[in-house]
Amino acid sequence: MSKQKPSLWRALRALSFIISIPLLIQYLVLKWYSTSQNTPTPVFHEPNHETNLTVWEVLSNDDRVSKFVDVIGKLPDIVRGLSAPQARFTVYAPVNEAFDSFYFPPDPPPFFGLFIAGCHMGPGPVPAERLPSMGTVSSFVNGDIFFTYKQRISVQKDKSGLTLNRAARVLPVNASQSIAVNGFVHHIDTVLELPNSTAHALRTRPELSKLRRGLEATKLSESIYDTNAHVSQTIFAPTNAAFDRLGKTATKFLFSHGGRPYLRALLKYHVVANKTLFSDSYWPHGGAKLMDLSLIPNKDSHQFDLPTLHNNLTLQVESRKIHKKWHLNVLKDQVAEGKSHDSIPVSMPDVILMDGVMHFIDSILLPPAKSEQRKTSWLSRLKSSLGHNKQSIEDLVTLLGPYIDEP
């Protein structure tokens, strides 16, 4: 298997993201130590299993993760944090075999170990029984340029088990290798890497080829790909199947020279700048704290009005817990006097990006009609619900015309 070679720009990006980790660890350790005299230490345990070992001791005693331990052991501040009984950590430890396909530079930069550490641990306890219900978990990598939020790691569940960032399979482990007095350890079969850019995500996803072509043709890619143009972003990414549902005639028109302004107006409705909504957490930015939906008691549904790239035009998005897992839906036309909504489900949530998050959708999002004469009829809604939502060129021109601007 070929080894993964991070390029220089990714290494520099790693430095910018995680350079604050030693300071963070030192601050947290001092805080934990200062409160330890007055605060009782709860012991996390599964039934019939208790431990007095710290996370660092659990890792050090486990031969399956010795290569990971070798990397972390060279970072005394992080070792000190993992050894603090008052700390609360969760570590996603790659097993030794995971490093066989991971590229170690012959002369790694000083921050290379921090890159490994930051991507594989986060604050707070996440026990094995809680992990399957989570859409994302926290790492110690900085998620924004202001160091307000910590980058998320996405969690996928299927019949085979759990996967992190659609790359690393969570492996079975016994209690003695996973439970510590100050947190939990999970074994994974792949080394996690820093999130890729939006451009890379679109370039490497064949099912998004039409979206990528549309962004580049309309020059929206210039701002969406440029991390200096925004703090963060949430992209509701229509797949090729979504464009196909518009119909060949409408799609051909949108990608023609004459239809390009309408395509630009359409795609701007799919991008949320400077707000980051994951399936189970929300970064409002502007100095506001992270909103963790799983920590809000007695509430299984949350709605968000997210500003799109169109002035004064928002997307209403709902995150709803179904069978203990959070699911995203983009709400469409309001019906029944505000009591219910049509919705478009997110088909693949939480594709973590360097500068935000991307959610795949299999239907195109159409902005609301500005004209009172262009209200959606019950027959149109019925056709849409049955999957027959092909649009005519006349319909698109009428709907999108008022939203046209120049690149």
From Swiss-Prot:
Pfam families: Fasciclin. The keyword Repeat applies. Keywords: Glycoprotein, Repeat, Secreted, Signal. The gene is aurS. Induction: Expression is regulated by the aurofusarin biosynthesis cluster-specific transcription factor aurR1/GIP2. SMART domains: FAS1. InterPro entries: Adhesion/Biosynth-related (IPR050904), FAS1_dom_sf (IPR036378), FAS1_domain (IPR000782). Disruption phenotype: Impairs autofusarin biosynthesis and leads to a yellow pigmentation via accumulation of the intermediate rubrofusarin. This is Aurofusarin biosynthesis cluster protein S. Transmembrane segments: none annotated. It is found in: Secreted; Secreted, Extracellular space. Part of the gene cluster that mediates the biosynthesis of aurofusarin, a red mycelium pigment which is acting as a mycotoxin. The first step is performed by the polyketide synthase which condenses one acetyl-CoA and 6 malonyl-CoA units to form the first intermediate, the cyclic heptaketide and yellow pigment YWA1. The C2 hydroxyl group in the pyrone ring of YWA1 is probably formed during ring closure by an aldol-type cyclization reaction. The dehydratase aurZ then acts as the first tailoring enzyme in the aurofusarin biosynthetic pathway by converting YWA1 to nor-rubrofusarin. Glycans are attached at residues 52, 174, 196, 274, 312. The keyword Glycoprotein applies. Might be part of an extracellular enzyme complex composed of GIP1, aurF, aurO and aurS. GO terms for cellular component: extracellular region. Pathway: Pigment biosynthesis. It comes from the Eukaryota. Residues 52-192, 195-365 form the FAS1 domain. Residues 1-35 form the signal peptide. It comes from Gibberella zeae (strain ATCC MYA-4620 / CBS 123657 / FGSC 9075 / NRRL 31084 / PH-1).
